[in-house]
């Protein structure tokens, strides 16, 4: 959604469904229409490191809408991003989950399915350039290693074999996925009812950034800084 149209979009959704105005995130709102969750994005995604965030917004602008293709799903034409961008976006989305609410196995499976189907369609030189700009080369290697070593995906011919250190990182990340899971449901669930909840939420994020900083060091560092604003400053502002 174009940022200038976001308010109007939410008004339309409120007429045909339910909108939770307290769940407006840093890049999207939340609504439910006929039992289906709808996330109107006014920004493709939000990253904590300013250079990483800038790189993604520039990459997104370069492919949307001019580079979209169309895929048929049950007779409906669905817009699809170029495979190169899609791969990098999936990786970056997983990184976000790692440092906040937890990464789910289903998200890694999504990437394994995507890579199994689209590896030959990716422009790998551009892919590496995108990852470099996002500071996410290591995260990509770790997630791809999990796909190969734990999910049984064949190593794409375009991807180099993994080092011992990468396998160690993948094992640690996989252990966290199995223990914590998507949105932290296996270990911790965010609550938003006062300062104590804000403090507990922040401690959870800071601990994850410390323990899993190896996945994407630049984002881990910035999460610790930026979430002070999200969990405390906004809470004080509302009061």
Show the residue positions of the predicted features.
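Conserved NTP-donor binding/palm subdomain of two-metal-ion nucleotidyltransferases/polymerases, i.e.
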Residues: 2-239
């Amino acid at each position: 959604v174009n940022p200038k149209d976001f308010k109007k979009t939410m008004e339309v959704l409120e007429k045909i469904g339910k909108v939770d105005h307290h769940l407006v995130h840093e890049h999207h709102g939340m609504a439910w229409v006929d039992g289906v969750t709808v996330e109107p994005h006014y920004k493709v995604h939000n990253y904590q490191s300013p250079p990483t965030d800038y790189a993604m917004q520039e990459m997104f602008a370069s492919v949307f809408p001019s580079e979209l293709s169309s895929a048929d799903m049950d007779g409906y034409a669905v817009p699809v991003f170029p495979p190169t961008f899609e791969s990098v976006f999936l990786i970056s989305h997983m990184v976000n989950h790692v440092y906040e609410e937890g990464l789910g196995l289903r998200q890694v499976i999504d990437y394994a399915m995507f890579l199994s189907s689209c590896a030959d369609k990716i422009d790998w030189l551009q892919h590496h350039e995108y990852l470099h700009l996002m500071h996410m080369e290591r995260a990509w290697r770790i997630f791809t290693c999990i796909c190969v070593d734990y999910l049984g995906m064949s190593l794409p011919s375009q991807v180099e074999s993994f080092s011992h250190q990468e396998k160690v990182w993948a094992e640690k990340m996989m252990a966290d996925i199995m223990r914590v899971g998507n949105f932290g449901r296996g270990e911790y669930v965010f609550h938003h009812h006062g300062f104590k909840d804000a403090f507990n939420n922040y401690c959870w994020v800071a601990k994850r950034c410390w323990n899993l900083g190896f996945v994407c060091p630049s984002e881990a560092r910035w999460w610790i800084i930026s979430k002070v604003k999200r969990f405390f400053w906004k809470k004080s502002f509302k009061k």
